[in-house]
Every structure is written in structure tokens, then in C-alpha cells.
Design a protein with these regions (language model features):
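Elongated alpha-helical scaffolds
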Residues: 54-120
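Catalytic centers of nucleases
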Residues: 2-77
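A general secondary-structure signal for short beta-strands and their flanking turns/coil
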Residues: 31-33, 54, 90, 183-185, ...
């Protein structure tokens, strides 16, 4: 059984439910750290205008045969070299698909790896590209609007965090121990993007 190909198929079916996403994922993709990308559009529909494209989100997909498909979260080891590549382009959504022995059931897990989180994961990186970092992945939603929300929210934060790729992250601890005058002109904002709840 080809777990990689089956995993991609299950993910393609899940993404195909939505009205905001167009997936371009290939099991034979030759990119170094990715299997393709997912186009994210502002407006729902089966045909999308170029002007409505928000962003292409890079994705990496791993498929594995596992008997237990009921876990709410899993851990998966990712090479530091891949994490560095994800940071360099502004982020990646990483998928792991568990498939049962007969291949007729699957559980999809994901981690939205944005610059801020990637920098935290890379703190322990010592320069050895063959070392791995264990990352937690959560269950991927099943409803189409929730699936679209994962990507819409990711694109929002990916755009917001791009500027931080080459900068030192500001932590709550550093804010508490620094001179307040340094931050007199800093404005903190928060945001979240979702689909309209008017469609099912």
C-alpha cells in the first residue's frame, strides 16, 4: 500500500470540500521541502478570479500506516533543514495523514508553521541539517468552512509575520524586563480571518 499517495488523496478530498481553496499537491513533486501549495481566495465559489487570490500557502504532506486513528494530536519529527526552509519563505502548513491497514479510513493532522513558531523551534538548531525537531500536530477539521478558516487564518498571520523573519522576536518576558521608553511607539495588533458563516 502506498501510504504517501493515499495520504495525498485523503487530503485532496478534504480540501476539495471548500469553496475558498484550490490545491496543487503532487506526490511526485521535486521541491526540496514541499509537496505543493494551496491557493486561498477571498470569495467562495467553484471558479475564482485572479483578483481574489489572497496567497499561495506552501504545504508538506506525509502519509503513514497507523492502526490508531482516534488521537486528537500527534507528534512528528521534522528536519531542522526543512524548518529553516519554511521560515525563509514565510511559513508552511505541515500535514501528516494516518491511514488504517486496509486503506479505507484516515485521520488528518496538521501544524500551521508560521515565522514566530518556526523561530522558537529553531532555537535549538546547532547547524546539523540532518537533526530533527519533534512538532505537535492537531486534528484537521472536517467541516468545509472550518477547513477554509485554517487557511484564511494562516494567510492573515503569514502576511503579518513576514517582517519578523529576519528580526529578533519580542517576548512577554523581554517586554517586562526592558525600559518602557523603548516601546513607546510600538502598536500591538491581533487579527483572525474566517469565512462567512452564511454558507454551509
Amino acid at each position: 500500500m502506498n501510504s504517501e499517495m493515499l495520504g495525498l488523496s485523503y487530503l485532496q478530498i478534504a480540501l476539495g470540500k471548500t469553496d475558498h481553496l484550490v490545491a496543487h499537491i503532487n506526490s511526485n513533486d521535486k521541491e526540496p521541502s514541499w509537496d505543493g501549495d494551496v491557493e486561498v481566495y477571498r470569495k467562495a465559489g467553484h471558479v475564482h478570479a485572479k483578483a481574489d487570490l489572497i496567497l499561495k500557502v506552501p504545504v508538506q504532506v506525509k502519509g503513514h500506516c497507523k492502526p490508531n486513528l482516534k488521537k486528537k494530536s500527534i507528534r512528528y519529527s521534522i528536519q531542522y533543514a526543512d524548518l529553516k526552509n519554511y521560515l525563509a519563505i514565510g511559513g508552511t502548513i505541515f500535514f501528516v495523514i494516518y491511514i488504517n491497514d486496509s486503506g479505507d479510513k484516515a485521520a488528518i493532522y496538521y501544524a500551521d508553521l508560521l515565522p514566530y513558531d518556526l523561530k522558537k523551534h529553531l532555537k535549538a538548531y546547532d547547524g546539523d541539517p540532518y537533526k530533527y525537531k519533534s512538532i505537535e500536530l492537531k486534528t484537521f477539521p472536517k467541516k468545509k468552512n472550518d477547513i477554509a478558516d485554517v487557511f484564511l487564518n494562516f494567510t492573515h498571520h503569514m502576511n503579518m509575520q513576514r517582517a519578523s523573519i529576519n528580526s529578533t522576536p519580542v517576548t512577554l518576558e523581554s517586554l517586562c524586563t526592558s525600559d518602557p521608553a523603548q516601546f513607546s511607539n510600538i502598536e500591538l495588533t491581533m487579527g483572525y480571518s474566517t469565512t462567512s458563516r452564511n454558507y454551509q
